[in-house]
Amino acid sequence: MKKIVVLLGMLLAPWFSSAVQAKGEAGEFDYYAMALSWSPEHCAIKPADRDQCSRQLGFVLHGLWPQYQRGYPSSCTRERLDPAMEQEFAGLYPSRFLYRHEWEKHGTCSGLSQHDFHQLASDLRQKREDPGRLSVSCRAAAQKPLPAQGGSGQCQRLAGPGQHHGGLRRRWRFLREVYICLNKEGTDAVTCSDEMQKRELPSCGQPDFLLRTVR
């Protein structure tokens, strides 16, 4: 069984906003990071997102992101999203905006066709309940902490057994996202890059985090 590496990052701003972006070549990357957002936290930050926040959702797919060991490629081609993808993979994302945004910014760097990229994302999303195959990085964005072991315990139940690093940054401790790191084929777990783990370390040194309820 693959080890699960859980990082609790309590950032209000997205982790990847401070990572290094590069134009990149389609298909040239090191691994995938699949981001699963905890919808109640997203909606607490962006309540105007009616597509997502008008429904009682838990974990939702934010995206499947090609990654380098340092940084990540972005917008590798100018290929626009085929509207048919929204119909063929209905429900893959919680909002229509994400279909276009995720394909054009991240999917174009996968080296896959639109159908194959969305199929891979769909397959991996469905396998999130089988964490034994995955390496996970949890990110949280905070107000009333769970007990000292509550945060790690909650994340462990979400992600499965393994190694844990928990924490906060800028006093924000609500669970926001879980990152699942996989090889380029999406078949096996890989350890999230040293850069990713180091960047989350200031957040991940604390023993608890908060989890908003689904309403």
From Swiss-Prot:
Known function: One of the few RNases that cleave the phosphodiester bond between any two nucleotide. Shows a preference for adenylic acid.
Active site: H62, E102, H106
Region named Disordered: 144-166
Protein name, as recorded: Ribonuclease
Pfam families recorded: Ribonuclease_T2
Keyword Hydrolase found: yes
Residues of the signal peptide: 1-22
Source organism, top-level taxon: Bacteria
EC number in record: 3.1.27.-
Localization (cell): Periplasm; Cytoplasm
Gene Ontology MF: a single term: RNA binding
The entry's keywords: Cytoplasm, Endonuclease, Hydrolase, Nuclease, Periplasm, Signal
SUPFAM superfamilies: Ribonuclease Rh-like
GO biological process: RNA catabolic process
Annotated organism of origin: Aeromonas hydrophila
This protein's GO CC annotations: cytoplasm; periplasmic space
Family, similarity comment: Belongs to the RNase T2 family.
Catalytic EC class: hydrolase
